[in-house]
Amino acid sequence: MHDYVTWLRHASPYINAHRDRTFVVMLPGEGIAHPNFANIVHDLVLLHSLGVRLVLVHGSRPQIEARLAARGLTPHFHRDLRITDAPTLECVIDAVGQLRIAIEARLSMDMAASPMQGSRLRLTSGNFVTARPIGVLDGVDYHHTGEVRRIDRKGINRQLDERSIVLLSPLGYSPTGEIFNLACEDVATRAAIDLGADKLLLFGAEDGLLDEHGQLVRELRPQQVPAHLARLGSNYQGELLDAAAQACRGGVGRSHIVSYATDGALLSELFTRTGNGTLVAQEQFESLREATIEDVGGLIELISPLEEQGILVRRSREVLEREIEQFSIVEREGLIIACAALYPIADSDCGELACLAVNPDYRHGGRGDELLARIEARARAQGLKTLFVLTTRTAHWFRERGFEPSSVERMPAARASLYNYQRNSKVFEKAL
């Protein structure tokens, strides 16, 4: 019960922030075929009940492949796009139609066995997407493969205003009545841009973008995306990342990539600070700045656990209030996640780096290095020549960053006289 109450308290600011916001959610055909699909539907219904305006875009690739195989047809691609001839279009229409019915049934059912028991909602679909043919590229005729020409923004917003969930399929229609097979990623991206959506949420097989070491990349700016695309090459994660960046460049506030295989990934991404996937956004996620008196409470929350473990020297609220101007902090969405302090040592050209701390959830993002660089820059600006640090647990971290072993005797007298021999901290120094 305590964990639930704690989670709800932490989620409450996000619940309020997401109300009446427009989210476009893209779920590929692989996600619909996955056993976790039912849980994703529950989470979408929960978002709807919390006042989120939802547009759901679904894919159909594996379902199309299954129908082609059943008919003995060979799929053809060029530039990673399906070539949709007449027989293939029949398979596309069949797959999309059945998927649409399956999604409508799942979203419309009375979820007797789900956490959202008794929920009722209205689902709307229609000819909201106008398309045009891709035509001929590199001498290859794409036939009925198309691209989005226009999204019926007014029509979709009218349905959202009436509290409906809007379902968009990867099919588009031309003014002359032709049907075109579309990429669901393109439909979702254009819908998010044209609707001025607050978020584009893209489901993939992975938790998000993984770096070359297999570690999750939690945050990106659109301008950082090309380097990752060059590394990824032609794969689906690259397609999702490219779609996320395009949406942000088109004015969408934030794009998220989460896994359809992880239960609760969508809710974790939307209602926790750390999230569960990769966030692509134009705005700055964090700020590195000097602390003010309003930050004292956040600093106490950050450093208290480390003080209790004996890693940091205890500082009372009164001490922090008096010394707040010595601190630099990293703030993320109102939460102080890292800090460090610079104390000039009297009657010398030396300073002390103290109280360097990073929230455990953010210790692999280089924030300690950012704070160290900020403290060193502040020290140089004040004319200091040497930076001392005292530590009981992180000697190697400082050695790796240019600090050399030192001693109490090498410290200026004003600081050496305050050395706590009971803590027996190791002393290091670095020439600036």
Curated annotation (Swiss-Prot):
Pfam families reported in the protein's UniProt record: AA_kinase, Acetyltransf_1
EC number in record: 2.3.1.1
Gene Ontology molecular-function annotations: L-glutamate N-acetyltransferase activity
Residues of the signal peptide: none
GO biological process assignments: L-arginine biosynthetic process
Localization terms from the record: Cytoplasm
Keywords: Acyltransferase, Amino-acid biosynthesis, Arginine biosynthesis, Cytoplasm, Transferase
Presence of keyword Acyltransferase: yes
InterPro entries, sorted: AceGlu_kinase-like_sf (IPR036393), Acyl_CoA_acyltransferase (IPR016181), Asp/Glu/Uridylate_kinase (IPR001048), GNAT_dom (IPR000182), NAGS_kin (IPR033719), NH2A_AcTrfase (IPR010167)
Gene Ontology cellular component list: cytoplasm
Functional pathway: Amino-acid biosynthesis; L-arginine biosynthesis; N(2)-acetyl-L-ornithine from L-glutamate: step 1/4
Catalytic activity: L-glutamate + acetyl-CoA = N-acetyl-L-glutamate + CoA + H(+)
Enzyme class: transferase
Occurrences of domain N-acetyltransferase (ranges): 286-425
Family: Belongs to the acetyltransferase family. ArgA subfamily.
PANTHER family: AMINO-ACID ACETYLTRANSFERASE, AMINO-ACID ACETYLTRANSFERASE NAGS1, CHLOROPLASTIC-RELATED
Protein name according to UniProt: Amino-acid acetyltransferase
